[in-house]
């Protein structure tokens, strides 16, 4: 029996997992690292801390697993996307990484849009332009840290830096390259037009390969330090969004999944990028060669739920204690009936991406009366998040048909949300056994395919559905009326959101 090691190099830390080739989870370990905020809109992490966490979690799962280490065939990483990691020709790190959440490069966004129209950028990259994309951060570094820019041999992504430490190779994959604002999503090559417009040298960008590319064996001295066999192959891997698609079992055209965590998104699998005329959705490059995953993403899904729990019940972010609060709130929701006077919640606590892409939008409760209770507001929050997801689904369905949807992510532990999402979306949903392991499963699948243990159809061994939920027919008509009011309310408040953003209290 062969084994596969996967790492989910996320925003809060690195999670290592060990799977058997038949899909069984053998061991897992997590180690966190610090995030730095050196100025307004600036968010950084130390890649050396990523490496320390990677080494720690690797050591811990090897100690937990009672297996012959020589049977570990491959390793792959799912990495946080849109980071920039500058290294010199020897692979030496030159500064802390500017990570995905950093928005300092707004100036570079304006400069690029002055040269290339937004619609042309969307056609080339498959995405709306954002200061979070790696290419804009590289342009910022060239302007404000020119010495560092000149000394940089390659600008890497998060997972690519760990791969460099393991193998000595400078490389990235299609899924990460697509989210740089420098890559042509149709030809899967660097866009000389966009690179030139930003004034960046293409020689400073790594070669791009399929996610399942074999980078070779771990360097002997590194393998010895980690306790891994030097025969263990390193497979290039993918960004976390792409890995989640694989780990959700979305590996064939038409497969669709919904991730419901702090943020949320709906992705479906296609043979071509989906270029929406209103630019409401974006397209990613899949780990399955030749496929894409058009997606619509919202900012504050589980975040809305955490906010309302903290505000009304004093229970904060979604950690271990949430298992109890989910059950408690589910019980209250089951015991209560929908109030005769409906409340609408617009879930825009952090602005919004899909489908309206409005950073000025804000969270809003409409229709409160003195007879409403706390639990009525909780219900409205769940409904509001679900309705925004329906709006995203409609944006996708204008271009392609969508059937059954698999739902993953920590928030889906709520029984009420499962039923409500199915009913409001009007779709049958399925829930897999390991709702929290999608990115790890995706990285493991990519490793196994890359080393030849199986092909992507083996995902059925890793992703096993344990629940199927149908829409509640008698509730759908009421929800359709509310959904219409939900969209009308947003449009009615657009100007108010914009003007409110200009009001600052001293």
Regions found by a protein language model. Give the residues of each.
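Active-site core segments that coordinate phosphate-bearing ligands/cofactors
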Residues: 5-6, 106, 113-128, 136-171, ...
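N-terminal glycine/serine-rich phosphate-binding loop of ATP-dependent small-molecule kinases
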Residues: 1-95, 123, 151, 223-224, ...
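Short glycine-/acidic-enriched loop or helix-start segments at secondary-structure transitions
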Residues: 16, 84-87, 96, 268-269, ...
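Structural signal for short hydrophobic segments within the conserved structured cores
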Residues: 27-31, 206, 467
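Residue-level signal for inorganic ion chemistry
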Residues: 23, 46, 75, 102, ...
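Short beta-strand-loop/turn "lid" adjacent to the catalytic site in phosphate-handling enzymes
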Residues: 63-100, 128-134, 163-184, 207-210, ...
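Short linear loop/turn motifs
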Residues: 206-214, 321-328
């Amino acid at each position: 029996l062969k084994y596969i090691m996967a790492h989910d190099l996320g925003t809060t830390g690195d999670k290592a997992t060990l799977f058997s080739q038949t899909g069984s989870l053998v061991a897992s370990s997590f180690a966190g690292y610090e995030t730095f905020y050196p100025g307004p809109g600036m968010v950084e992490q130390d890649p050396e801390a990523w490496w320390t966490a990677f080494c720690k979690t690797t050591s811990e799962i090897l100690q937990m697993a009672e297996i012959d280490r020589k049977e570990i065939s491959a390793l792959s990483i799912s990495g946080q996307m849109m980071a920039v990691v500058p290294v010199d020709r020897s692979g030496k790190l030159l500064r802390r990484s500017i990570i995905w959440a950093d928005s300092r490069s707004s100036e570079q966004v304006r400069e690029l849009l002055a040269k290339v129209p937004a619609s042309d950028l969307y056609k080339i990259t498959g995405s709306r332009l954002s200061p979070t994309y790696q290419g804009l951060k590289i342009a910022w570094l060239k302007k404000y840290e020119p010495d560092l820019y000149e000394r940089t041999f390659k600008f890497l992504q998060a997972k690519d830096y760990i791969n460099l430490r393991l193998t000595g190779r400078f490389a990235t994959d299609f899924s990460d390259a697509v989210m740089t604002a420098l890559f042509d999503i149709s030809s899967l090559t660097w866009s000389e037009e966009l690179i030139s417009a930003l004034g960046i040298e293409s020689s400073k960008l790594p070669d791009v390969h399929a996610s399942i590319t074999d980078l070779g064996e771990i360097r002997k001295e590194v393998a010895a330090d980690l306790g891994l066999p030097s025969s263990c192959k390193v497979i290039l891997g993918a960004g976390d969004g792409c890995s989640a698609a694989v780990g959700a079992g979305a590996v064939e055209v038409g497969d669709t999944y919904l991730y419901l965590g702090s943020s949320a998104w709906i992705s479906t699998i296609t043979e071509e990028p989906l270029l929406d005329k209103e630019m409401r959705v974006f397209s990613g490059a899949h780990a399955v060669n030749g496929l894409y995953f058009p997606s619509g993403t919202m900012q504050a899904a589980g975040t809305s739920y955490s906010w309302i729990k903290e505000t009304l019940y004093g229970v904060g972010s979604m950690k271990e204690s949430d298992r109890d609060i989910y059950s408690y709130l589910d019980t209250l929701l089951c015991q209560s009936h929908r109030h005769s006077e409906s409340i609408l919640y617009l879930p825009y606590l952090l602005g919004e991406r899909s489908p309206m892409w409005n950073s000025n939008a804000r969270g809003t409760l409409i229709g409160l009366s003195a007879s409403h209770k706390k639990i009525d507001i909780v219900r409205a929050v769940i409904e509001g998040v679900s309705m925004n997801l329906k709006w995203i689904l409609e944006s996708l369905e204008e271009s392609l048909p969508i059937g059954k949807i698999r739902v993953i992510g920590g928030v889906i532990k709520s029984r009420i949300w499962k039923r409500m999402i199915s009913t409001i979306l009007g779709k049958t949903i399925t829930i897999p056994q390991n709702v929290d392991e999608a990115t790890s499963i995706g990285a493991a699948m990519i490793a196994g395919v890359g080393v030849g243990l199986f092909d992507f159809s083996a995902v059925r061994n890793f992703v096993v559905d344990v629940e199927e939920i149908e829409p509640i027919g008698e509730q759908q008509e009421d929800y359709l009326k509310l959904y219409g009011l939900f969209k009308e309310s947003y449009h009615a408040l657009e100007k108010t959101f914009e003007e409110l953003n200009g009001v600052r209290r001293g």
